[in-house]
């Protein structure tokens, strides 16, 4: 009897695996490179420029292809047409995030919007952000902060120009955005070179690094113990403790009744008022406040700086475009002495340069991972549930079906002619620097405000040249990829005062 039960069990098991194998084979999965047992295509991935590697694969396998990364299936989208199908037509089925160890820990178990799941909590918090934190009126309220910090940066450049020296624009712009973000988020201005700013930057960079790190347990659930052996788990635990301690100190300062009154309410002031009022169906805790602060500081500090650096890099490589941008700004502003935010709508070519820079060098080259909630079809191919989805925004920006035969060329005029109506607000799927759909970046307007004002003033106040002995063709365009895509080699230029 026992033998019969064993035989029956073996037959049932064999039938199960046979049926599962048959079902898998019947799926029409997107094509892709063959991988190795267990690790899949992990050994083929490029760590530093994954967007370039995935773009090359799209040329071999098409605008949608699949890979195996350890035990996870990955599908990559590389065309505007399929990006629209994913982010608009079927957006709701692709709103989930894969549960990755570093992201879960550093985002307060998904309370932060960028890495959280699409739940009732997410929808309520996003609505709160759009109404209370990132509305046009709230963004405008921080205008004095942006303009004051911009003038501080201009003063440093004036000093260098007086001495016929050079300036490291990469460093100056990062300092500008760090100061603006700290004042907007915390109501505090740190000394750029002081210990408080250093602590903030150290914590921020380690947080960003761990948010972008894949752990063994993410790819090989049965080998999670390797995270402990390699020290990754200890590093994650230490980093989160330092982050949490820092944010708790800021909350305690905000709650201090003896704290000096702020001229403009900072984001932390607004969030703590929401904490006191408890207007939501879900309890809003200190952990929620900290997670919302991360939504502001993690993407805000270096992305705006990266955009301006790339824009200035392209203009210095293309002198005709530089002259056209400067002529426009100087014609519109005249002898006013500075560009203010109300002037920006009158500078269409400057806006076109920003768009073209974002197209060629999207600061988030691969949109944050999504995960299929249920079985789906994209581009006629089957996408099983729990598949990780990547939209290669860098590749989409080079899609010849969307951009014609010259997608690799820097031509700002395209946004004033054949692509005049194309914008980055999520409805034009050939340009996706902020994503699109239900998971689109809610702080887009805040981010662009931090790009336009320093960029316009750099063009208005100074003429720019390369250091002696360097030609435009010598400029290296190598990238340094993290959560944001920076120019790897700092942009060092020589300023000459114009006004």
Curated annotation (Swiss-Prot):
Gene3D superfamilies given in the database record: Cytochrome P450 (1.10.630.10)
One Pfam family linked to the record: p450
Cofactor(s) it depends on: heme
Description of the deletion phenotype: Runt phenotype (small plants with hooked leaves). Epinastic leaves and defect in root development. High levels of endogenous free auxin. Altered tryptophan genes regulation.
InterPro entries the UniProt entry points to: Cyt_P450, Cyt_P450_CS, Cyt_P450_E_grp-I, Cyt_P450_sf
Induction per the UniProt record: By auxin and continuous red light. Stimulated by DOF1.1 and, transiently, by the generalist herbivore S.littoralis.
Membrane topology: Single-pass membrane protein
Name recorded for this polypeptide: Cytochrome P450 83B1
Organism: Arabidopsis thaliana
Lineage, uppermost ranks: Eukaryota, Viridiplantae, Streptophyta, Embryophyta, Tracheophyta
Record gene name: CYP83B1
């Amino acid at each position: 009897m026992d033998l019969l039960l064993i035989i029956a069990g073996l037959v049932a098991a064999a039938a199960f695996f046979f049926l599962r194998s048959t079902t898998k084979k019947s799926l029409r999965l997107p094509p892709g490179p063959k991988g190795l047992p267990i690790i899949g295509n992990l050994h083929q991935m490029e760590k530093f420029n994954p967007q370039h590697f995935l773009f090359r694969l799209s040329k071999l396998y098409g605008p949608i292809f699949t890979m195996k990364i350890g035990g996870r299936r990955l599908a990559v989208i590389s065309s505007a047409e399929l990006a629209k199908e994913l982010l608009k037509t079927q957006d709701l089925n692709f709103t989930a995030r894969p549960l990755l160890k570093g992201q879960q820990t550093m985002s307060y178990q998904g309370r932060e919007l960028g890495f959280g799941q699409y739940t009732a909590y997410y929808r309520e918090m996003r609505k709160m952000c759009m109404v209370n934190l990132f509305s046009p009126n709230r963004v405008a309220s921080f205008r004095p902060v942006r303009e004051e910090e911009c003038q501080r940066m201009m003063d440093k450049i004036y000093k260098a120009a007086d001495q016929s020296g050079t300036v490291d624009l990469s460093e100056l712009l990062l300092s500008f955005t760090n100061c603006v973000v700290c004042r907007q988020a915390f109501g505090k201005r740190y000394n750029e070179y002081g210990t408080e700013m250093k602590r903030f930057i150290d914590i921020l960079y380690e947080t960003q690094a761990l948010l972008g790190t894949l752990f063994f347990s993410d790819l090989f659930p049965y080998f999670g113990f390797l995270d402990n052996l390699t020290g990754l788990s200890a590093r994650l635990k230490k980093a989160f403790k330092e982050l949490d301690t820092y944010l708790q100190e800021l909350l305690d300062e905000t709650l201090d009744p003896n704290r000096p009154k702020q001229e403009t309410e900072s984001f932390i002031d607004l969030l703590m008022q929401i904490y006191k009022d408890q207007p939501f169906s879900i309890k809003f805790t200190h952990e929620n406040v900290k997670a919302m602060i991360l939504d502001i500081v993690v993407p805000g500090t270096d992305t705006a700086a990266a955009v301006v650096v790339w824009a200035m890099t392209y203009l210095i490589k293309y002198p005709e475009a530089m002259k056209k941008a400067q002529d426009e700004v100087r014609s519109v502003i005249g002898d006013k002495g500075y560009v203010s935010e109300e002037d920006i709508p009158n500078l269409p070519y400057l806006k076109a340069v920003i768009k073209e820079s974002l197209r060629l060098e999207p600061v988030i080259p691969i949109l944050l991972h999504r995960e299929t909630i249920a079985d789906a079809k994209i581009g006629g191919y089957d996408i099983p549930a729990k598949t990780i989805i990547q939209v290669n925004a860098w590749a989409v920006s080079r899609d010849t079906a969307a951009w014609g035969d010259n997608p690799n060329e820097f031509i700002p005029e395209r946004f004033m002619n054949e692509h005049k109506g194309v914008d980055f607000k999520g409805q034009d799927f050939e340009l996706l620097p902020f994503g699109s759909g239900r998971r689109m970046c809610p702080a887009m307007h805040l981010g662009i405000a931090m790009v336009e004002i320093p960029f316009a003033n750099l063009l208005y106040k100074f003429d720019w040249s390369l250091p002696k002995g360097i030609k435009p063709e010598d400029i290296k365009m190598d990238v340094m990829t993290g959560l944001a895509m920076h120019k790897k080699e700092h942009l060092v230029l020589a300023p000459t005062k114009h006004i």
